[in-house]
Amino acid sequence: MDTVETPSPVDRLTITGAPSGDATEDPATSLLALPWALPLETWPREVLAALPRGISRHVVRFARMGGGIVAVKETTEELAFHEYRLLRRLERSPAPSVVPVAVVTGRTEDDGTPLPAALVTRHLRFSLPYRAVFSERLERRTLVRLMDALATLLVELHLEGFFWGDVSLSNVLFRRDAGGFAAHLVDAETGELRQRLSTGQREHDLDVAAVNVGGELLDLQASGLLKPERPS
């Protein structure tokens, strides 16, 4: 019987990325140490960082890479490259967003079973998803500050010609900033960058925000994390 040698899972990998921000190391060097031959939801605890995760339509995990922490999101190859390119362009703008590290494609399990592509972004230190901010019942003024931060981010993105398409608290990370919060775009999957947004595109983002954020606030209230408004 003939034996046919197949490439190892590592040999099949393609890592597309470049040093970003203050990073000087080629991301591929550190990324190769991660267990790409395993589905992301089964990665061993020793490579993961126990940080609060927001709600996502994809599997997302925080992993230790070199001396830092990265967020890894499984998605399609097309969407991974689309989001990576958008985040790279936004990195050069005043609008705050997470820093892209790489796209990992060609992932397979040891038996050759294909695995999804992955987008890798640098973890935003001291940031929290909105539900973690409300991990204890907080006053409504906290909510007002979060909404102010989200509105500020949306204005900044629109000024850069960024059509978000899926405005929500879930697609943002928050950091405390001078008594309030600063919002950072964390999910640009549905976004598009244009020279200039039309009035219709801006209004579409506002309509989507009203629906999505309204649903998220109702969810917070149902979970007992948002204090009900006192009657005046």
Language-model-detected regions and their locations in the chain:
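Charged, low-complexity intrinsically disordered tails and linkers
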Residues: M1-A49
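Conserved ATP-binding subdomain of kinase catalytic cores across diverse folds
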Residues: A28-V144, D148-G165, L217-L220
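Generic beta-strand structural signal
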Residues: P116-L119, S170, F181
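Short, flexible active-site-adjacent loop segments at beta-strand->alpha-helix junctions, enriched
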Residues: L124-R125, A178, E189
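Short, contiguous, pocket-lining structural segments
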Residues: T142, D177, Q201
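Hydrophobic residue at the +6 position relative to the catalytic HRD Asp in the kinase catalytic loop
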Residues: V167-F174
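Activation-loop N-terminal segment of eukaryotic-like protein kinases
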Residues: F174-G180
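C-lobe/activation-segment region of protein kinase-like
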Residues: F181-S232
